Amino acid sequence: MVGLPTHTLSVLVEDTPGVLARVAALFSRRGFNIESLAVGATECKTMSRMTIVVSAEETPLEQVTKQLHKLINVIKVVEQEADNSLSRELALIKVRAEAGTRSQVIEAVHLFRARVIDVSLESLTVEATGDCSKIEALLRVLEPFGVREIVQSGVVSLSRGPRGIGTVR
């Protein structure tokens, strides 16, 4: 939704079947669109971490957060504040790069500290990591060359410093 503040939630869950479906269903029932979702292993083999990005007003988000805490298999929910956390995503971008423009594309890629991971006669595939604004800026620079295909991971986020989401109830 345009104009609503964006929130990043870290949700620590038990690594069991159906947890993702229950969490996603809760957001869906409340009318939230999940803008980004990444799920992966944690330092504890029995738990997974979900990073969920949504645009919402504070009060409705607080209600959803309280309901998340009530779900079986949800251990902890933390909102990652931008100034106290690090967030990154990965993008793979296939861009047209024929002989006449290839060096320009490679130069643009290097300016963003991205890297070329595949080369063909007519295209390059680029791997870029960074915050959302960096990925968006790279896409704007590559667009005039002809972006053929894009895939982006969801955002992943960790708190800065020694504090973390923890692994106990």
UniProtKB/Swiss-Prot annotation:
<comment type="pathway">
    <text>Amino-acid biosynthesis; L-isoleucine biosynthesis; L-isoleucine from 2-oxobutanoate: step 1/4.</text>
</comment>
<dbReference type="InterPro" id="IPR004789">
    <property type="entry name" value="Acetalactate_synth_ssu"/>
</dbReference>
<dbReference type="GO" id="GO:0009097">
    <property type="term" value="P:isoleucine biosynthetic process"/>
</dbReference>
<comment type="similarity">
    <text>Belongs to the acetolactate synthase small subunit family.</text>
</comment>
<dbReference type="InterPro" id="IPR002912">
    <property type="entry name" value="ACT_dom"/>
</dbReference>
<protein>
    <recommendedName>
        <fullName>Acetolactate synthase small subunit</fullName>
        <ecNumber>2.2.1.6</ecNumber>
    </recommendedName>
</protein>
<dbReference type="GO" id="GO:0005829">
    <property type="term" value="C:cytosol"/>
</dbReference>
<dbReference type="GO" id="GO:0009099">
    <property type="term" value="P:L-valine biosynthetic process"/>
</dbReference>
<dbReference type="Pfam" id="PF22629">
    <property type="entry name" value="ACT_AHAS_ss"/>
</dbReference>
<keyword id="KW-0100">Branched-chain amino acid biosynthesis</keyword>
<comment type="pathway">
    <text>Amino-acid biosynthesis; L-valine biosynthesis; L-valine from pyruvate: step 1/4.</text>
</comment>
<keyword id="KW-0028">Amino-acid biosynthesis</keyword>
<dbReference type="InterPro" id="IPR039557">
    <property type="entry name" value="AHAS_ACT"/>
</dbReference>
<dbReference type="GO" id="GO:0003984">
    <property type="term" value="F:acetolactate synthase activity"/>
</dbReference>
<dbReference type="InterPro" id="IPR054480">
    <property type="entry name" value="AHAS_small-like_ACT"/>
</dbReference>
<feature type="domain" description="ACT">
    <location>
        <begin position="8"/>
        <end position="85"/>
    </location>
</feature>
<dbReference type="InterPro" id="IPR045865">
    <property type="entry name" value="ACT-like_dom_sf"/>
</dbReference>
<dbReference type="Pfam" id="PF10369">
    <property type="entry name" value="ALS_ss_C"/>
</dbReference>
<dbReference type="GO" id="GO:1990610">
    <property type="term" value="F:acetolactate synthase regulator activity"/>
</dbReference>
<dbReference type="InterPro" id="IPR019455">
    <property type="entry name" value="Acetolactate_synth_ssu_C"/>
</dbReference>
<keyword id="KW-0808">Transferase</keyword>
<comment type="subunit">
    <text>Dimer of large and small chains.</text>
</comment>
<dbReference type="InterPro" id="IPR027271">
    <property type="entry name" value="Acetolactate_synth/TF_NikR_C"/>
</dbReference>
